Amino acid sequence: MKKFTILLSTLLGICSLALVNAQTNINTGAISGKVLDEKREAFPYATIGLLNAKDSLAIQGTLTKENGQYEFKDVSMGSYLVSIYVVGYKKVFKGPYELNSAKSKIQLEAVQLVPDAKQLQGVDIVKQKPLVERQLDKTVLNVENSTLAVGNTALDILEKSPGVSVDKDGNISLRGKQGVTIMLDGKPTYLSSEQLANLLRSMEGSAIKSIELITNPSAKYDASGNSGIINIKLKKNSNFGTNGSVFAGSGYGTYYKANSGFTLNHRKAKFNVFGNVDYGRNKRFNSLDIYRVNNTLLDRTIFDQTSDNIRNRNNSNYKAGIDYFLNDKNTIGFVFTGYNSNGDSQADILTLIGSTPAVGDSSVVGKNLSDSKYTGQTYNLNYKSSIDTLGQELSIDADYARYNGREVNAFDNLYFAGGQQTRAPYLFQNGTPSVVKIWSGKIDYTYPLQKDMKLEAGIKTSIVTTDNDYRFLNFNSGTNQWENDVTRSNQFIYDENINAAYLNVNKKFKGTSVQIGLRAEQTNSKGNSITESRIVKRDYLNFFPSVFLNQDLSKNHSMGLSYSRRIDRPDYGSLNPFIYYVDLYTYQFGNPFLKPQYTNSFELSYSFKKTLNTTLGYSRTSDVITEVLLSDTAKKTLFISNENLATQKSYNLNISSPLPITKWWSTNNNLTVYYNRFESPSLANAPYESGRLSFNFNTNQTITLNSTTNFELSGYYVSKQVYGTLLIDPMYAIDMGLSKNFMDKKLNIKLAANDVFNLRESKITSALPSQNYLVKQKWESQVFRATITYRFGSNNIKGARERSSSADAEAKRVKSGAQ
């Protein structure tokens, strides 16, 4: 605790020093102005130079902002020229201008640039970015102009991302490892894996600008997420005015689907207002088959269960915010986001029970009716100060989030043998109302120590309270009423406080970039099972170092090396010790004694001409949190829980190659080969180890038919793999899409076909020799969609600032989500 207090005091001292250094020298002045294009609209990112009037030597340099304005501060008294340069336009010189004690601030008249025809003849301006870009610390998937963006959901697009795989429940893995932290515009999603899958299924691909895959995050990020961070950046709308877009789409697989929404952005000199709403209706079919053999010394029982499920779900996502520009250096903002998800489902279940395959001595006919509602709201208040032109910045975020969930499942079970009903129907219900509250705040500070060296520092705190009130009800046929079963009901309250601080130092040499960081996180938690009168407390302090090194070997060759240590804390709901019934013979329960898992990751990367990118990685995770499926031979049931397996070692090789084959055909291919090995000294009362060499492959082919029409074909293949006690069969699919623009790209129509050949399904068996089961799931993956989008207003409006709020680590741990 003493070390942590010293670290916090050091950071606060640095922030105080920044405010002192921000004082303006009274012996200097400032020169400012604005640049316009040929249409007299603001010209962003023009190169502006400040020259000495005597010898024309450069004194300072800058770029115009999105509103076309620029400013040189802390300029010594004297005579100066101003130069303006943009490729494709004639170069402009203005001045001389005299700064003195009588005139220390000079505001120049706006300068209108004139196109240079000679330059334009030799310049090809290409605005569309490649689908995949490799940057120093991340891989960027530019979704905005992809034909498969519209007609696919965010979850569909993630599945096509390099090195990313999504399982049947929507759990996301990166390079063969689970535990990914998902962010939206650098902000937390505040959701469990289940809720997150539901949100991503409801989010339209047309709203996404790009997806960032960060496999080895720096100390600036929360230490949670052993396989890294996926940041989904939504589209933004750079001058004053109003713009937006509306879209509507429909699709059909087994059932009809529909979606619609709009975005709006309005920017003035002092403020920017933005918002978006999208709505989706999705009815889908899902089949689940479970074949299980229960062996004892006395008998052998086979359970052969088939289930057909139809789900209806209505989702709405909304966001509104405002940025207020106090001046050109300071901005304060507020963002409100929310979602509503309402759904119901009906599952018809047939279970054959006997000693011979496909022949049941008895059977259970079941019907499961489910009704659910989930709502969530997050509030973010933020402040950013660009203290000087050298890169000194201060950023502050405060967040509050509240989530409410309610799901009720009703089970009707009828028992038959020899064609006759053998006993009275068994009817029961379970309900899972839950409330999650999150308060968090953080401060980030950047200070340039030298020209090519900077310091980053920050502090953060978060407080989380969850309340899960699980209820189990039996139907009393005598009174014709539902009665609470106190032996199967439970209230579980979980409180957690995490305090963190970090330091990062970045240094650039000739062809070399180095970054060293250290993050400290102190965790205090308490889980309270009210019904069982059981309290589990944990208090611990951890340090998370990170190192990044990149070397340009030559013009076409570069190499990188990185290391980081990370943590994964259990989902809040996974700590709840009480039983949740999936059906009559399958149930799951939490483990209050789950410990966090820790991962040390190493990566070696190589890039050739930024087109062939190779990464070799190794990680070791201790106390791995893994979902296990085990049999209760006495009760002849299958139960699902989470346990800390001893160790996971992961080796992975990733090769990515975006290649333009011709002017009209480009391709991007990504191959990840990985070997995950799990070892435990005791699982199901015996030592256990598993491992398998696996791979996944993604390919995307883009064909430009003409200036307004694109065709895309994409596919993926995930080989057989082992994760913990689960042996997962291969998964694969092929998608295609066609995009056509009209009305100078204001109107767009896209057609998309997901899983064209209806190949996608999931098969899971046990990797434990003592367990014998097969879980097979086929969902409605073959869907054909059509979407129309219309954009209105100016195409150059600067949208909302992207914020990284203060609760990234808490985002994916909220439990009780719906799908």
PLM regions with names:
Residues A53-Q69:
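Short, acidic Ser/Thr/Gly-rich low-complexity loop/linker segments typical of extracellular
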Residues N490-E496, I567-T615, R620, I640-N652, ...:
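Outer-membrane beta-barrel signature, preferentially recognizing the C-terminal barrel domain
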Residues T306, Q429, I438-K442, E483-N490, ...:
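Outer membrane beta-barrel strand-and-loop segments of large Gram-negative receptors
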Residues A110-Q112, A154-D156, L196-L199, L213, ...:
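N-terminal periplasmic accessory domains that precede
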Residues K73, L99, K187-T215:
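Short acidic/polar hinge/loop motifs at secondary-structure boundaries
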Residues K233-A248, S287, Y291-N294, D304, N524-K526, K555-S601, L616-K635, V756-P769, ...:
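Surface-exposed extracellular loop regions of Gram-negative outer-membrane beta-barrel proteins
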Residues L36, T47-L51, Y85-V87, S104-T147, ...:
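Short, acidic, small-residue-rich periplasmic hinge/interaction motif at the N-terminus
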